[in-house]
Every structure is written in structure tokens, then in C-alpha cells.
């Protein structure tokens, strides 16, 4: 799966490297998968197989390194990620808590491996953890490296809220305690900065907004054939929380009033094994509505396929059923001049207000989405204006360069405010 957080972190690291900084992007759990040039290191720390074994069998918490290398190898981890295993938050409660306990958790050996490696590296000026679920590392890293610790925030609440009790409460308590070792949090949207400040009980002064940015190589504006079908698109992970079922319902309502003109609904994105039945059900619903021939799932796409897919759309919508904190898919669609219709929740309003690249409607309202599609279908001038505004807005505010500039300022401020700590 192309993970949105991995895409963001890899794009940021690549841009910082291009700007002359020394950057080490270290994979955790599994090798980084991105549809751009991968700048992450080859060695994976906290290999997913080791973490799992150490969680469930005490023997593996004490095995020597030469044995660990067998299941920490890249080939073994890649093989494991290809297995069709359901990975849902409820089944990961104990593991999440253990990881957040840091050196008191079952993965203490893995922390030792990471610290041993870091001691041999040139001294870092700052360390940035990719998400709050790794905050069990904050105190050990600060103690050993004597440098400021930052933590990106990019969607942890959805995972945490999906944990069964007592794991959710235990995890939140551990994150809140570990936050004392963090010098700055980097939420990827203003919405998420405000929300996570309250959710985690972290002072607003520790929140530093670090907007998303994308690498625009290859993102040229679409050239649509007006004689073809009006194409509504969905580009995100195929799962209930991303709202494909909401979009299918909206499309059916849209087609109820536009049967005289050709149209289609295209979807693309990663489909996890546990959500195959979800997609099958949606396909069946479209068939019952007499629209099966207009609905197509294109699968998971590489970078070239993704850009070509987006360029084939007249409008894109990902009506997420939760408050999405990122919305990289919006930036990618707008970058090729495709207008979007989105629910007014999460980070969507601030992205559209800043770019002007789409229409906001009430959340969980299929009729409102359908009306947005009809508005764009009936008014080609409006569709073109929104598409042009979105493309310009992304280039003005949401490039990898803009993201790197902001993060540079945050890092510099954190280093400047942090008094030098004595080294061991």
C-alpha cells in the first residue's frame, strides 16, 4: 500500500536533501513504500515480524542479533506485507500499549538496537518521529542523543479511537505522559493542530502547523474531451471511513436527474483484504441501481497511473465519514486542474478556502454532493475556473518546497530554543 504518511515524509526528506541538509529517513516496521524516488534508508528498525514475535513470545525478546537479522531482512518484511492479513486497530491494542511503554514494553530490545545505531551516526540537530504512536521512543532518544525531539501528527486519532478498551485509554495516557519529552508537535493541518491540542492535552504553544506539500513532477493539467462521459472520481484507500459508499449513493442520486447524458464513476486506491466484501457490496448496489456498467474500480495505481487517472476526471470527491486531517488526494487532483466536491469537515475547508479549487457541502449529505456534481456538469465555465484556481492554489501553497520551508523554520526555532544538553 502507498501510505499517505509515507508519501508525505519521503517527499519532505527528499526536498530537505535537495536544499542541502543532511537527512536520515529511517523506516519503521516495514520498508517505506512510495511512488516517488525513495530516499529512506535500507535498514528497517522495529521490523514488523520482530515486534510481533516479541509481543507474543518472551523467547524472542532475548534472541541474539544474528537470528533477528533473519526476520528483519528486507525480503522477509516484504514477503510479510504481501500476506493477506487483516490489520485492524482492535487487534493491535496490546501491541500499541507495549510500544508506547518504550523501554518498559516488550520491544525494549528493538529500542536498544536503534540507540546503538544512532550512537554511531554523526550527531543530529533534531529528531522527528513520524506519528504519536511512536512516542515511547521520545524519552530514550532525548536521553541518549541530547537533542530536541519533534513529532508529526497526521491521523493518529482515528486509529486510537478504534482501539477497544482498556487499550485506548491506556494508549492516550501514555502518549500524554510522553509528550513532556517532545519539544514540538507538527500537525499537518490547522484543524488537526486545534483538535490534537485538546485531544492529547498538549499546550497550543507546542503545536506548529506544518502544511502538506506534494512533488509536482508530472502533474500537468488535464485536457478533457467534452464529448466523453462526465467522470466522477474517487482516489483514496477503499474503506468505509473514506466514504466510497457515500459517493456511490450520491452518484445514484446524481444520475437520477442526469440520465440523458453519459457519465461514469471511477474509483482507485488500495483495497485491504478485510474490505473486499465492502467493495463487493457497493458493486452490487450499483448493479441494483442499474449503474453497474458506469462503475469501475481501477485498483492501486503507481505514480504514472495515478496522474493519468486524475487527468481523466471531471470532478473528484472523497466524502470521508470522519474528520480527515490530511487530504493529500485533494492536492493531487487539484494539481492537474480537477475540481473537487468535499464535505465540510476536518482539513477539507482550510484546503479549499486556501486554493479555491472546489465546492464544500454539508457532511454526510449525498444530495448535496449530487447537487455539486450537477453544478459542475451544467456549468463548464465554473468547472474550468475552479480547476484553474485549484492548480494555481496548490502551486502557491502546497508544494514540497513550501512544506520544507515551513519545517525548516520549525526545526530552527526548536533548536534555537533548546539549551545545549551535556553529552555522555
Where are these regions (language model features)?
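Nucleotide-activated donor-binding/catalytic signature segment of Leloir-type glycosyltransferases, i.e.
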Residues: 279-304
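A conserved catalytic-core segment of Leloir-type glycosyltransferases
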Residues: 25-116
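Short hydrophobic beta-strand element within catalytic cores of glycosyltransferases
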Residues: 339-342
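Conserved donor-binding/catalytic core segment of Leloir-type glycosyltransferases
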Residues: 225-242, 248-252, 266
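Conserved acidic donor-binding segment of nucleotide-sugar-dependent glycosyltransferases
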Residues: 354, 359-366, 375-380
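Glycosyltransferase donor-sugar binding loop
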Residues: 264-283
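A short, well-ordered alpha-helix in the C-terminal region of glycosyltransferases
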Residues: 368, 375, 382-397, 403-409
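Carbohydrate-associated surface elements
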Residues: 191, 213
Amino acid at each position: 500500500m502507498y501510505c499517505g504518511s509515507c508519501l508525505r515524509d519521503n517527499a519532505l526528506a527528499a526536498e530537505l536533501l535537495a536544499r542541502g541538509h543532511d537527512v536520515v529517513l529511517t523506516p519503521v516496521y516495514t520498508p517505506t513504500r512510495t511512488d516517488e524516488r525513495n530516499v529512506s534508508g535500507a535498514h528497517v528498525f522495529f521490523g514488523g515480524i520482530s515486534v510481533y514475535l516479541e509481543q507474543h513470545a518472551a523467547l524472542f525478546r532475548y534472541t541474539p542479533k544474528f537470528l533477528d537479522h533473519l526476520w528483519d531482512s528486507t525480503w522477509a518484511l516484504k514477503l510479510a506485507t504481501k500476506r493477506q492479513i487483516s490489520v485492524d486497530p482492535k487487534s493491535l491494542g496490546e501491541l500499541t500499549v507495549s510500544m508506547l511503554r518504550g523501554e518498559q514494553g516488550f520491544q525494549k530490545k528493538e529500542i536498544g538496537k536503534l540507540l546503538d545505531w544512532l550512537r554511531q551516526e554523526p550527531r543530529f540537530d533534531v529528531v522527528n518521529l513520524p506519528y504519536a504512536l511512536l512516542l515511547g521512543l521520545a524519552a530514550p532518544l532525548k536521553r541518549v542523543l541530547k537533542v530536541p525531539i519533534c513529532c508529526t501528527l497526521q491521523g493518529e486519532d482515528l486509529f486510537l479511537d478504534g482501539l477497544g478498551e482498556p487499550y485506548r485509554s491506556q494508549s492516550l495516557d501514555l502518549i500524554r505522559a510522553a509528550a513532556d519529552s517532545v519539544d514540538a508537535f507538527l500537525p499537518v493541518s490547522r484543524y488537526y493542530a486545534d483538535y490534537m491540542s485538546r485531544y492529547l492535552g498538549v499546550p497550543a504553544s507546542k503545536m506548529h502547523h506544518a502544511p502538506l506539500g506534494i512533488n509536482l513532477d508530472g502533474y500537468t493539467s488535464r485536457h478533457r474531451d467534452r464529448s466523453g462521459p462526465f467522470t466522477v472520481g474517487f482516489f483514496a484507500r477503499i474503506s468505509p471511513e473514506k466514504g466510497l459508499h457515500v459517493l456511490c449513493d450520491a452518484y445514484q442520486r446524481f444520475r437520477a436527474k442526469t440520465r440523458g447524458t453519459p457519465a461514469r464513476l471511477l474509483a482507485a486506491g488500495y483495497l485491504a483484504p478485510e474490505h473486499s466484501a465492502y467493495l463487493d457490496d457497493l458493486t452490487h448496489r450499483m448493479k441494483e441501481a442499474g449503474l453497474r456498467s458506469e462503475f469501475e474500480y481501477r485498483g492501486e495505481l503507481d505514480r504514472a497511473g495515478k496522474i493519468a487517472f486524475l487527468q481523466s476526471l471531471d470532478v473528484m470527491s472523497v466524502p470521508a465519514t470522519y474528520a480527515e486531517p490530511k487530504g493529500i488526494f485533494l492536492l493531487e487532483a487539484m494539481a492537474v486542474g480537477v475540481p473537487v466536491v468535499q464535505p465540510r469537515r476536518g482539513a477539507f475547508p482550510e484546503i479549499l478556502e486556501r486554493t479555491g479549487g472546489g465546492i464544500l457541502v454539508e457532511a454526510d449529505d449525498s444530495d448535496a454532493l449530487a447537487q455539486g456534481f450537477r453544478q459542475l456538469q451544467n456549468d463548464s465555465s465554473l468547472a474550468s475556473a475552479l480547476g484553474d484556481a485549484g492548480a494555481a492554489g496548490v502551486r502557491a501553497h502546497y508544494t514540497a518546497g513550501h512544506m520544507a520551508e515551513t519545517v525548516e523554520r520549525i526545526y530552527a526555532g526548536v533548536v534555537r530554543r533548546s539549551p545545549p544538553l551535556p553529552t555522555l
